[in-house]
Amino acid sequence: MQWTEVSVMTTNEAVEAVSNILQEAGASGVKIDDAADYANLKPGKYGEIVDLDSIPHRTSGAEISAYYPETIFVPEILPTIRQRVQELTQFGLDPTPGTVTTKAVDDESWATAWQKYYHPVRVTRYLTVTPSWEKYTPVQPNEHVIRLDPGMAFGTGTHPTTRLSMTALEMVVRGGETMYDVGTGSGVLSIAAKYLGVNQITAFDLDEVAVRSAKTNLDLNPIATDVVAKPNDLLKGIHHPVDLVVANILAEIILPLVPQAWENLTPGGYFLTSGIIADKLAEVVAAQEKQGFVIDNILQMKDWRGVIAHRPTEDE
């Protein structure tokens, strides 16, 4: 079977948004080649993860490649893709250069091409993300290994927004909590939360493809097989308060989630948000404070921000 590969050259900050655009246009899979991921592979405080010189890698920006089957007439969807990429500036994201190119590929070529870009990476103090096909043994005490099968649409777990979310979880989880993972995607945050001691988790995503992907990854991690993953639009229709609500989604989606999170958090419960570009932070913080949340901490990595907030108790 022949496929059409549609590739977009863009910035690190626009990777997730461009990936969403391509998938919403009907892509059967997405490959992400992000220079930021390779930067994270360099030796650091947790030691060397991989020999960077041993793999081909991008030194700046990012390329997102999506794959469309013969049943989709790609020339018809290209104008919309180009327009939506350029419109990302309206959401505070820089998509430049935003160039879109296409080429034909066969089934075998795209089915395995992405694997060379994915390696074990120490994401936080306690959490390492590794692909399911690579053997990896923890090298430090209390290191938890999250195994993912990203398939042909994946994130490595090293994007700043994911790192911020995992760091926030490490800061607030004490063990035994209940949690909602909103916009779960690959399910990586639910798996991380289980390793950190969260007891009961329900993961939601509007995209049923993402839900299936999350279920696959949950099954790869025995500690997380009891996580319930199902389709839902944010927390609409959910009326059962929990101790934690986690959302790694764009600021524009966080805003309508704020009142839903408030209604679904127990007093003292934490609301952890990421996916916030720096220019949108003030708007997100203002919305949370207006709702009644107390802002505990602002985390930052590159141009991205994460917010740790909680619903105050009656005594506060």
UniProtKB/Swiss-Prot annotation:
Domain of life (superkingdom): Bacteria
Sequence positions that bind S-adenosyl-L-methionine: T162, G183, D205, N248
Gene Ontology terms: cellular component: cytoplasm
Top class in the EC scheme: transferase
Keyword flag Methyltransferase: yes
Pfam family, one: PrmA
GO biological process: methylation
Protein location: Cytoplasm
Gene3D superfamilies the record matches: Vaccinia Virus protein VP39 (3.40.50.150)
Main location: cytoplasm
Keyword entries, A-Z: Cytoplasm, Methyltransferase, S-adenosyl-L-methionine, Transferase
Record field: catalytic activity: L-lysyl-[protein] + 3 S-adenosyl-L-methionine = N(6),N(6),N(6)-trimethyl-L-lysyl-[protein] + 3 S-adenosyl-L-homocysteine + 3 H(+)
The EC number(s) this enzyme carries: 2.1.1.-
Gene Ontology molecular-function annotations: protein-lysine N-methyltransferase activity
Physiological role: Methylates ribosomal protein L11.
NCBIfam families assigned: prmA
Family: Belongs to the methyltransferase superfamily. PrmA family.
UniProt protein name: Ribosomal protein L11 methyltransferase
Gene: prmA
